[in-house]
């Protein structure tokens, strides 16, 4: 086992952007007391996305019931109950930001009977009521594999249904101890087979996986009906989180992109700063994916 990845390379140095769009996005989110995965998960693309007037809305609060070792979101066994005004607040924020394509995600809420699925449905419907014509990408949790909860959300027919497997199966115990690799694949498969949705998933690299394992997981995703994939570098949020095993080079990310395309994915984003909702509008299907 090596002692670590060493000094962060130049290609991982973040260029901070600001300006009027950044300030107005931050002001809008603060005014409505809205959470974003950009801020809660310490995303490296926050400045870029907010400067372009985009954000990924985080539903069900900013406290998760799980403790994945890669994630910066806070954890508790019993977070506060969901804000009943959150769906309407997000709908108004989408309208104010003039978004054509809105991205929603949420924390895991294993403390709620339906995992928060009803709140998801209320948010989707509120957005569509106020913003006719907007397309939605829903980056959902696994709802503990509860098919009724999954179906509640999938029946709303979001334009893109996203669920991240995050890493290869050999790293699940260390990275996602409260999740199951096969369960996450089953979420993707259900969205495709039962509801014919455009499907998407994401993985992080630099967490101890091998290239062979990554390629095998990409084929697993395709075999379960996944259309689109993102691959990005894992960056340790704090000293208490899982250490980075290595920094993947831009050339390797390009090779991963080619591997994914060869596996049959319709859209692929692969790069050091790529995250599941990064440039999500580029994944918006212009034709029905099946």
UniProtKB/Swiss-Prot annotation:
GO terms for molecular function: 4 iron, 4 sulfur cluster binding; lipoate synthase activity; metal ion binding. It catalyses: [[Fe-S] cluster scaffold protein carrying a second [4Fe-4S](2+) cluster] + N(6)-octanoyl-L-lysyl-[protein] + 2 oxidized [2Fe-2S]-[ferredoxin] + 2 S-adenosyl-L-methionine + 4 H(+) = [[Fe-S] cluster scaffold protein] + N(6)-[(R)-dihydrolipoyl]-L-lysyl-[protein] + 4 Fe(3+) + 2 hydrogen sulfide + 2 5'-deoxyadenosine + 2 L-methionine + 2 reduced [2Fe-2S]-[ferredoxin]. Residues 50-266 form the Radical SAM core domain. Its EC number is 2.8.1.8. Keywords: 4Fe-4S, Cytoplasm, Iron, Iron-sulfur, Metal-binding, S-adenosyl-L-methionine, Transferase. [4Fe-4S] cluster 1 binds at residues 38, 43, 49, 277. The keyword Coiled coil does not apply. Its cofactor is [4Fe-4S] cluster. This is Lipoyl synthase. It comes from Chlorobaculum tepidum (strain ATCC 49652 / DSM 12025 / NBRC 103806 / TLS) (Chlorobium tepidum).
């Amino acid at each position: 086992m090596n002692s670590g990845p060493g000094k962060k390379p130049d290609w991982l140095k973040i260029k901070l952007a600001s300006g009027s769009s950044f300030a107005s996005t931050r002001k809008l989110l603060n005014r409505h007391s809205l959470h974003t995965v950009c801020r809660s998960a310490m995303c490296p693309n926050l400045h870029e996305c907010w400067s372009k007037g985009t954000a990924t809305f985080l539903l069900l609060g900013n406290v998760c019931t799980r403790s994945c070792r890669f994630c910066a979101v806070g954890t508790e066994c019993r977070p506060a109950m969901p804000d009943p005004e959150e769906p309407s607040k997000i709908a108004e924020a989408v309208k104010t930001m003039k978004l054509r394509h809105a991205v929603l995600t949420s924390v895991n809420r294993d403390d709620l009977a339906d995992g928060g699925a009803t709140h998801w449905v209320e948010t989707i419907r509120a957005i569509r009521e106020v913003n006719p014509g907007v397309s939605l990408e829903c980056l959902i949790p696994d709802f503990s594999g509860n098919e009724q909860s999954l179906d509640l959300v999938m029946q709303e027919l979001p334009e893109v249904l996203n669920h991240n497997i995050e890493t290869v199966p050999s790293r699940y115990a260390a990275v996602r101890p409260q999740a199951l690799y096969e369960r996450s694949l089953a979420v993707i498969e259900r969205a495709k087979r039962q509801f014919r949705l455009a499907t998407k998933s994401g993985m992080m690299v630099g967490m101890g996986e091998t290239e062979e394992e990554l390629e095998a997981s990409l084929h697993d995703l395709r075999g379960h009906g996944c259309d689109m994939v993102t691959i990005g570098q894992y960056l340790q949020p704090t000293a208490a989180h899982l250490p980075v095993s290595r920094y993947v080079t831009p050339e390797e990310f390009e090779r991963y992109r080619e591997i994914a395309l060869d596996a049959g994915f319709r859209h692929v984003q692969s790069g050091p700063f790529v995250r599941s909702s990064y440039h999500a509008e580029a994944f918006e299907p212009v034709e029905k994916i099946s």
